[in-house]
Amino acid sequence: MTTFYTVISWLSVFGYWLLIAGVTLRILMKRRAVPSAMAWLLIIYILPLVGIIAYLSFGELHLGKRRAERAKAMWPSTARWLSELKECQHIFANSNSEVASPLFQLCERRQGINGVKGNQLQLLTTTDDTLKALVRDIELARHNIEMVFYIWQPGGLVDQVAESLMAAARRGVHCRLLLDSAGSKQFFRSPYPAMMRNAGIEVVEALKVNVFRMFLRRMDLRQHRKIVLIDNYVAYTGSMNMVDPRFFKQDAGVGQWIDMMARMEGPVATTLGIVYACDWEIETGKRILPPPPDANIMPFEEETGHTIQVIASGPGFPEEMIHQALLTAVYAAREQLIMTTPYFVPSDDLLHAICTAAQRGVDVSIIVPRENDSMMVRWASRAFFTELLNAGVKIYQFEGGLLHSKSVLVDGQLSLVGTVNLDMRSLWLNFEITLVIDDDGFGADLAQVQDDYIARSALLDGERWNKRPLWHRVTERLFYFFSPLL
């Protein structure tokens, strides 16, 4: 009996180290950033069982077998649709400004289509303006409404949006609503899903959270896009979730959330539509490609208006696309670079690009919230401040609430707005959407908004920053080490 237990003990020890060795080898063989690999190895060797379970759950990008098969199956039809779209040459921009050309060329070669022109574009900077405009557009809808959001939380003006959406469905408008399971958990626990389905709205819970399937699909992979499409002509996207900030996270101690949205009319609605169609097919298996380009786009033909490129990122879309786009935009800057983000945990490449821009004479400003709803991100982001300050980057800490807007403005001409945070989750993991706008008029509008943010912010003083307590420095470095996992 003693021999039996001895054998079992040795087999357990052997299996234990074999499992650690196997996971270690898998991490080393995967093509990933060195800081990320080192962080995972540290966790596994300090807390082996916890680390292995965490890595198998969150360490690799598992879309899930069923969704991966759908993503693979949809591309032939999507490619044909894009080929038909490219025949409508009148909607595509033939040239771009000097600062925007590299980024638009990158997008065209990686995504297959160029930016579209002739769009009307309005920047909305308050929740009230956005939700009221959205209600008006829903009330005017005649054919179809598609929406995707990370968070939909009932309450306040959001309930007016829900009521107008149900009224539209009852009068015959085809309505689809795609909401992230984790972000919109309060919505799915409310009476609204049943009410909306009874009204005729297709409501889909995206990327359902199921602990029993945690090893089959990465649970923290989230649908982070915010898109509204109405009659294939009007579109919205930006940083705002479907929430009324007067009722959202009031106990978080960070103040009201500050967002911006873009309202568009024109052919960009069609390019956003193909992104929505892909998301819908990946989640439901149903194909809903936008109407044929000729029927849908001809009314949009205009010589004036904004030129916009759409960047869709996430599993099943061109790899590293948004990361490459941000790097290209930063390196294109010659005079000024302004970035706003609620979560600043950049990759090493992006950090170095920003610092290099400042060191070659570009006026670089980063606007982040002073208070953050994520304690881990708050400390991790502070670990980058010293390097940024030493390079000459100006860091503004917004004091008027949780600044949730995501924007980049390059030389007053090239603008990027959308859902992407400057952190690892947005850059490498989540489903995100970004608008790239080549227009100095829109750039002036965005600059005005950013100037307002700066006026409500405090400039971080380098000398005072260097005198912060030792325990702050230690905490920052601790969270910095795990920043590749945030």
Curated annotation (Swiss-Prot):
Q: Which UniProt keywords apply?
A: Cell inner membrane, Cell membrane, Lipid biosynthesis, Lipid metabolism, Membrane, Phospholipid biosynthesis, Phospholipid metabolism, Repeat, Transferase, Transmembrane, Transmembrane helix
PANTHER family of this UniProt entry?
Answer: CARDIOLIPIN SYNTHASE, PHOSPHOLIPASE D
Report the subcellular localization: Cell inner membrane
Output this protein's name. Answer: Cardiolipin synthase A
- Please report the record's description of how this protein sits within the membrane: Multi-pass membrane protein
The GO biological-process annotations, alphabetized, read as: cardiolipin biosynthetic process
The residue range of the signal peptide is none
Per UniProt, residues of the PLD phosphodiesterase domain are 219-246, 399-426
Q: Per the UniProt record, which EC number(s) apply here?
A: 2.7.8.-
Can you tell me which residues form the catalytic site?
H224, K226, D231, H404, K406, D411
By sequence similarity, the record places it as follows: Belongs to the phospholipase D family. Cardiolipin synthase subfamily. ClsA sub-subfamily.
Which reactions fall under this protein's catalytic activity? 2 a 1,2-diacyl-sn-glycero-3-phospho-(1'-sn-glycerol) = a cardiolipin + glycerol
Residue ranges spanning the membrane: these are 3-23, 38-58
